[in-house]
């Protein structure tokens, strides 16, 4: 007989979590905030609980009071656990986003408990993983126990989102708003310039992937006159909504899931979540499908738009760390950089402002000591700043250096030219 879950208060339901267990926590807009706050409040009875997750919203896992009780074994570092990971209260697992489900499915990271957030069950007894299928589906299917936060505010999203209610060992009814994020608020003139330059690289009929951040949102604002665009992206944000409504994104040229916007998680405003609710044009699918370079490369003109922390003069891209300080993670950047490169007419793009908020150049002679190389100089193609765009594919290292210097801020070009001369003797 199927295991029939019983609704319980959060405090009682979380008694299922015990010391020395590995616990998966649903992420992004699907972060089960109510359950997580209750779990953290129970810290005194728990020791050495390993929390496995990607980006979390609405909770703080950085408090020194959690040391010894919880260990943050992060698959993608974010503000919620960044201090913890860099202070010894946790660590980071370098892994392509497309391969994270394999850690669960192959028993490399066996899960004792999965804490997820879902929509209420429909008349057939199925709940939706809603805004975040990503790695949650594989986690929920392999964990020994599943605790579900059932939230009427979670949209019922179409695709690979459905999970039977009787899969849960215990359920907690929580009526709370989903966390919201706005990427357009931080946009400035530089981001807008970059958005226009990248938009000029996007051809009609292209299939787009937009990474996380302000720049991808700025690109979307400049695509209103494009035609027959398709969407196959790990993340879906507010900027795509007007382009779907006006027919720019009609997905007519795609070879993989034609006619539908393919994504793996949604993160943005309540407007976005309402738009996705029971909207048949959106297909939210497992991350090991959406981000598989072999699959996405079958689409035409895949244009992958991602950002970075710094790029060296040979084209090495650091996107996950500031020196040895772990800032984020590998995520899906390489999945899409490679997939776009393999696509007929594809364009892998790294788009960055030329300088940081402190005025430091993002085009650098060498990456900082200890920095992680996410996109290698063998995988890099297009680089864009507010000063232009260049395709490094096929260039030797000296040619790359000269091209990248022209994308740097004028205040830093002379220093970069000296570094280039010292290295290449020309």
PLM regions: where:
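Conserved alpha/beta enzyme-core scaffold
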Residues: 1-426
